[in-house]
Amino acid sequence: MQSNKMTKETKNVLQRGLENIHHPVSNFIRAQTTSSLFLLFATIIALWWANSDYAQSYQALIHTQLGFFIGDFELKASLKHIINDGLMVIFFFLLGLEIKREVIAGELAQAKNRRMLIICAMGGMVCPALIYSGFNWSLDSQIGWGIPMATDTAFALGVLTMVRKHIPSSLVAFIVGLAIVDDVGAILVIAIFYTQEISLMHLLSACALIGFLGVANYAGVRQPLFYFIIGVAAWWAMLKSGVHPTVAGVTIALTIPAQPKLASGKWLEKAKSIISAIQNKSKNMDVLGNKGHHEQVLKVRDFAERASTPLRRWEDALDLPVVLFILPLFALANAGVVINLSSFIESVQHPVGLGIISGLILGKLIGISGACWFALKFNIGCLPDKVDLNHVIGASLIAGIGFTMSTFIATLGFGDQDTALHVAKTSILLASVLTAILGLLYLRFVSTKA
């Protein structure tokens, strides 16, 4: 009788612990939705500040020089550069962790899902780039062809929550997978096409350090401090190489261990035995007053950590700082453009503006939905349950929200072209708002007809 009671209590303890473990996709969606709210708030502040009587103080703040010196060595950069070249590396590191998880255990782990997502994402990148290039062919502004390729995952999922009751949950997972592949494409574009002069020595040093991390992962090294120190050195070498340092963030993330040190079956056995031992020794379950129980609880914690993966732990640890701090700071430093009727008119008349607006709205729509139709027609891939081509058309409009990544690419491509950069940022905002509204209206219309 007592044994049955202990077994029941043990199961209850384990059940309560397991109830705290949520599905990775659910956690990802919730984090991205929260991120969209903070991003929106920071964007509104930046726009208000840049268009108010305090606009001069805004420009002074983002161009404030910060740094330190030791003897003759001096490291100094503007606040905007610190955010774009430093803090955003952490965002891209988190992005790399998410990409690795999706490839190993997420939507991209299954071949049939992977084929459809890759085909749709390729269409959603190539078509906008071609449309932009058509408007800017042989012009200096042609360098901005990568701007309309990107999708802002946080804003896209945030917008989708407005119609979440009217769309299949599998559509949200589809867009998450689509955005992940899209991010991979954007990262490759940044690494290959938005790199100026390359220092081969520094680039080889960065590659060697990242390769060393990969070997360490294979050898079973799991200490966070080790990966942090070598990772910072790789970031510095990448920064000096001429390749944008955010590329280092992604590649370092791919070396982070994704396998647990302790199999889940063994961890459950050990946890059960420890809980049973605690129950057998004493009825006093007070951890504070009972040193033995305290030590046993620490053992359970140690086993639990060994049963989880460094990749998931670090992803969870970075999620909140990126959502609450890094992405809003990026929006605050980069979204402050002067907007008025004349700036919107200039955007729709300028080749850069025409290329970005057409690329994000029409390019994403034609590219993603067209690629999906092609894949279905020739049986190359399949859609998730309850998702049809009409849903994909709505999703392709939502994918035209390119705020964060598009703005980031615009700052790389037009860093020394003030007019083009201003038009690009204004056009990204305008196109993102328009395509979000169109996507919401279309998905709502489709749901009423279903």
Curated annotation (Swiss-Prot):
The chain crosses the membrane at residues 35-55, 79-99, 117-137, 143-163, 173-193, 198-218, 224-244, 320-340, 356-376, 392-412, 423-443. The keyword Translocase does not apply. Its main location: membrane. Keywords: Antiport, Cell inner membrane, Cell membrane, Ion transport, Membrane, Sodium, Sodium transport, Transmembrane, Transmembrane helix, Transport. GO terms for biological process: regulation of pH. Belongs to the NhaA Na(+)/H(+) (TC 2.A.33) antiporter family. InterPro entries: Na/H_antiporter_dom_sf (IPR023171), NhaA (IPR004670). It is a multi-pass membrane protein. This is Na(+)/H(+) antiporter NhaA 1. PANTHER family: NA(+)_H(+) ANTIPORTER NHAA, SODIUM ION/PROTON ANTIPORTER NHAA-RELATED. One of its GO terms (cellular component) is plasma membrane. The gene is nhaA1. GO terms for molecular function: sodium:proton antiporter activity. Disulfide bonds: none annotated. Na(+)/H(+) antiporter that extrudes sodium in exchange for external protons. It catalyses: Na(+)(in) + 2 H(+)(out) = Na(+)(out) + 2 H(+)(in). It comes from Shewanella denitrificans (strain OS217 / ATCC BAA-1090 / DSM 15013). NCBIfam families: NhaA. It is found in: Cell inner membrane.
